């Protein structure tokens, strides 16, 4: 993967505005445990519509894209929460989503993606890893590719968790 310039605070702030109405502003709760002078807080991202913070990044990436690039739909390469985030976001935006998975992906993961409206494309595991690590393209795929980890908008969207933590617990 190519190195990225560090994200700026403004990118996280824009993402925070961008995900309004889709991602839930989850609570930050203190865990009640007696550990020598230690405070532990939990950010309850399990309350997101897909049960994961990955929704934040997927939504921000799609809402930040040029609408013309979304006309053919979106696709990603993931076996789990990012795939569900892209599928959920695409369904909400009324566009097509395809998820490229390794051919040995588990039935439960595939069922969750399909339940959210995603089309599934199975490919050999080695090709799937190459797609994520190097090529970011695959024959026959159309639409906007949303990389599950190295997409700048995905990173900014997921980083909105940090902004919420700072708002709820400024002295963190």
Where are these regions (language model features)?
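PLP-dependent amino-acid enzyme catalytic core
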Residues: 1-172
């Amino acid at each position: 993967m190519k190195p990225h310039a560090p994200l700026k605070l403004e990118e996280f702030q824009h993402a925070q505005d961008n995900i309004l109405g889709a991602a839930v502003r989850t609570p930050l709760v203190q865990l009640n445990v007696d550990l020598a002078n230690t405070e532990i807080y939990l950010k309850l991202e399990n309350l997101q519509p897909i049960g994961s913070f990955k929704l934040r990044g997927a939504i921000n990436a799609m809402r930040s894209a040029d609408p013309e690039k979304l006309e053919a739909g979106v696709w990603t390469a993931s076996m789990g929460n990012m795939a569900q985030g892209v599928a959920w976001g695409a369904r909400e935006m009324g566009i097509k989503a395809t998820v490229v998975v390794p051919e040995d992906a588990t039935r439960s993961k595939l069922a969750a993606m399909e339940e959210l409206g995603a089309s599934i494309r199975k490919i050999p595991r080695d090709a799937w890893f190459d797609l994520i690590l190097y090529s970011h393209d695959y024959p026959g795929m159309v639409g906007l590719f949303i990389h599950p980890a190295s997409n700048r908008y995905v990173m900014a969207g997921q980083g909105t968790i940090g902004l919420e933590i700072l708002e709820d617990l400024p002295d963190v």
